[in-house]
Amino acid sequence: MPEQLKQRVETCYQQAEAFFKRRFPRPEVSFKLRGQKAGVAHLHENLLRFNLQLYRENQEDFLRQTVAHEVAHLVAHQLFGDRIQAHGEEWQLIMRGVYELPPNRCHNYDVQRRAVTRYIYRCPCPQSDFPFTAQRHKLVHQGRRYLCKRCREILVYSGETRVE
């Protein structure tokens, strides 16, 4: 699957070279991106990072729009330097003129949030559930104490967890 994506990066560069009549150095392409971002262009490293999960779930639009979006960032940087805005007129020119695509800043892919376990802490106050993250729960085990803002008592782990 990543081969199609790499081929689209190459196609975008060939389009930019034909349009601007000059060569551009090819970037390193990485698939080590997670979370809500579909892609990221690292301008000074000449690196493109893509989210494989979002690519798999939105392949057609990803290849057409997202890859061109990120390549346009690198091309704009190589043409116009550091002093341009990320989604400014230079980048928009490349999106419209070179790739004939709308210069959309953000994708609208459905991003699934991963399930997160919360550790329930309580104090003597009525209805006093305090859901702690795994990181905060670990800090309590290492000796950190948290107080209720109302009664100023130390929050105590209830033994319960819930998945959000």
From Swiss-Prot:
GO MF: zinc ion binding
Name the PROSITE patterns on file.
ZINC_PROTEASE
Q: Tell me which UniProt keywords the record has, alphabetically.
A: Cytoplasm, Metal-binding, Zinc
Upper lineage: Bacteria, Pseudomonadati, Pseudomonadota, Gammaproteobacteria, Pseudomonadales
Q: What name does UniProt use for this protein? A: Protein SprT
Q: Which organism is it from?
A: Pseudomonas putida (strain ATCC 700007 / DSM 6899 / JCM 31910 / BCRC 17059 / LMG 24140 / F1)
Q: Where in the cell is it found?
A: Cytoplasm
- Provide the SprT-like domain boundaries: 13-156
Q: Name one GO biological process term.
A: response to stress
